[in-house]
Amino acid sequence: MLRGAPGLGLTARKGAEDSAEDLGGPCPEPGGDSGVLGANGASCSRGEAEEPAGRRRARPVRSKARRMAANVRERKRILDYNEAFNALRRALRHDLGGKRLSKIATLRRAIHRIAALSLVLRASPAPRGPCGHLECHGPAARGDTGDTGASPPPPAGPSLARPDAARPSVPSAPRCASCPPHAPLARPSAVAEGPGLAQASGGSWRRCPGASSAGPPPWPRGYLRSAPGMGHPRS
């Protein structure tokens, strides 16, 4: 009976080893240090925690100048909004005992004010003259104005044509040798009044200083016969 007790202990120890092998875990050695596993686990967790920190540092960092420029733009935008709302509040002429309307209340009141004004204008339109804007008359009026602008009416002023074009051309009388070059020429009809006469600028007739009273006129022979409008030559 005393010898069988150690045999039971060996079989129990072998069963414990078999169960440990089935579980897949290594048997704890008698001299092993369990604190190493804890240290390894801590190191692994620290590495995982350092990875996202490294990724954040990899992103491009915005410079200080860019941040300041963005802040200035944002302040300018807000300032413009506030100025616009203040102008709208002044146009609405609200009186809240010194209090300022909120932005939503200002917009709502402006919408109601515009709707009321539009209804009043549609109900009783004020008489007025024709509008000169092309947008107010539609495409038909724009087409009419385009046609009239393309073909302007002819001017009602005097004609610019030369009066000499309608009159028959009459040859000019020859100048006297003793007359100045700028003296006016005599008309062909002045031959009947006497030789050696020339018409002055005032309409009076004067005698050329070098022309004789008895001599014939200095015009070429047969001038009166060949001049137009003087009739047929005599035989």
From Swiss-Prot:
Oxidoreductase is among the record's keywords: no
Region described as Disordered: spans on this chain: 1-69, 132-235
SUPFAM superfamilies recorded: HLH, helix-loop-helix DNA-binding domain
GO molecular function annotation: DNA-binding transcription factor activity, RNA polymerase II-specific; protein heterodimerization activity; RNA polymerase II transcription regulatory region sequence-specific DNA binding
Basic residues bias (residue ranges): 55-67
Effect of residue 74 to L: In CCSPD; uncertain significance; requires 2 nucleotide substitutions
An annotated GO cellular component: nucleus
Kinase found in the keyword field: no
Superkingdom as given in the UniProt entry: Eukaryota
Outcome after substituting residue 75 to L: In MSSD; completely abolishes the transcription activation with the dimerization partners TCF3, TCF4 and TCF12
Localization in the cell: Nucleus; Cytoplasm
A family per Pfam: HLH
GO biological process, one term: regulation of transcription by RNA polymerase II
Keyword terms of this UniProt record: Cytoplasm, Developmental protein, Disease variant, DNA-binding, Nucleus, Transcription, Transcription regulation
Annotated disease: Split-hand/foot malformation with long bone deficiency 3: A disease characterized by the association of split-hand/foot malformation with long bone deficiency involving the tibia and fibula. Split-hand/foot malformation is a limb malformation involving the central rays of the autopod. Phenotypic expression is extremely variable between and within families, and even between limbs of a single patient, ranging from syndactyly and oligodactyly to the most severe monodactyly with only a single phalanx.
Subunit and interaction comment: Heterodimer. Efficient DNA binding requires dimerization with another bHLH protein. Interacts with TCF3, TCF4, and TCF12.
Record's protein name: Class A basic helix-loop-helix protein 9
Source organism per UniProt: Homo sapiens
Organism placement in taxonomy: Eukaryota, Metazoa, Chordata, Craniata, Vertebrata
